[in-house]
């Protein structure tokens, strides 16, 4: 995980910590019910609440209010959908609303094994909210 980026809904899931294992366990439980929808969401508060943001982590952050506007458009879908915004570094995403955010390196803080390419393919989500 976090090696290649642009992960699709069907790509293998390889949790790397207890939090990720708990999320994956929840997904597995929900998938036992065929009439379910699993949303893999990448969102954050608005405004971005931190004074620093990672310049080396690629992800698909979106603000929670954007998701709220589109959530009902997803309600009749079954399966798994990646939900997020345009692929970007966390720093570039955060700077769109606050130019004063400083950069910080996840690799320097967490080490070389930290997953830097966390982005997802969001094609199914974009199609669903049209």
Q: What residue spans do the PLM features occupy?
A:
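Alpha-helical elements of Rossmann-like donor-binding domains used by nucleotide-donor carbohydrate transfer enzymes
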Residues: 25-29, 54, 66-73, 82, ...
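Substrate-positioning beta->alpha
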Residues: 41-76
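Active-site Tyr-X1-5-Lys
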Residues: 14-42
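Short glycine-/acidic-enriched loop or helix-start segments at secondary-structure transitions
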Residues: 1-4, 48-49, 92-94
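Amphipathic terminal alpha-helices
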Residues: 120-130
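Active-site "gating" loop of Rossmann-like NAD(P)-dependent oxidoreductase/epimerase domains
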Residues: 1-16
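Residue-level signal for the nucleotide or nucleotide-sugar donor/cofactor binding architecture
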Residues: 61-62, 88, 120
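Mid/C-terminal beta-alpha module of Rossmann-like enzyme folds, strongest
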Residues: 70, 74-117
